[in-house]
Amino acid sequence: MELRRLVRGRVDWPRLEAIVRELRERYGREELHVRFLEADNWLSTPMVVDDEWFVKVISKQNSLVHALFTTGRNLGAFSSGTEGFFEHFGTPLEMAEHELEATRRMREIGLNAPEPVEAFEVDGFGVLVLEYLPHFQSLDRLDREREKQLAPAVFEALYTMHEHGLAHGDLRAENVLIVDDDVYFIDATNVSDEGAEDSWSYDLACALAAMEPLIGAKATVDAALESHTPEDLLAAIYFLDFVNIRPDHDFDAAALKGVIGQRAT
């Protein structure tokens, strides 16, 4: 087994079969059609079941990788002049339960998110079951004009999260899904209540970083200012360099800082 496969915690088929059997029994199905997603995902094995449920299988290795990511992100937060606000989960089941609850809370405050079904454990694996959204596109798969049109809605949804005391913690273009011109958030991570305000600024920095390569710095800042204040964006500036060193973000931090500085004066 190659190292990347081992570290990512990919689940062998016999173990997946046990999980599929559990799903079949829980939902009263004689047969289930399972389709695995070709996703570059270090934190779970994702699959679509009967085109009805989106299922994440989370292994102990996935939990270990999450712990490593959490440590790295907290070190990055320290480098931005604030205490770390990311939190780790103790077990694969806790990872699944957190995402289930985060998805439920987003829906409760009126945001679009897949309908949460349940989280449970099978042989030490955490299993998360959500509604499957069959006709979605991730934000970065749209044409530029449509991305510009939807950008204000992305920032408004993020503002709504923060107004209700929630934080996403891992906002990237692939975690923003578009279904019939509606914006859906997925894959929220775990942040501490004590670091709420810093985590909101970090979220906003991530949103700016996700949008800038798609529509440019000026259009990104204009879209953000439809729901956020210049002071909000100035607070986010402190996290842009930290976000910029993440391998899953690639954007022009200097351009964003320049436009934010112009708008804030």
Regions found by a protein language model. Give the residues of each.
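Conserved catalytic cores of large enzyme domains
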Residues: 4-11, 63-79, 123, 263
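Short beta-strand micro-motifs within the conserved protein kinase catalytic domain, predominantly
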Residues: 115-125
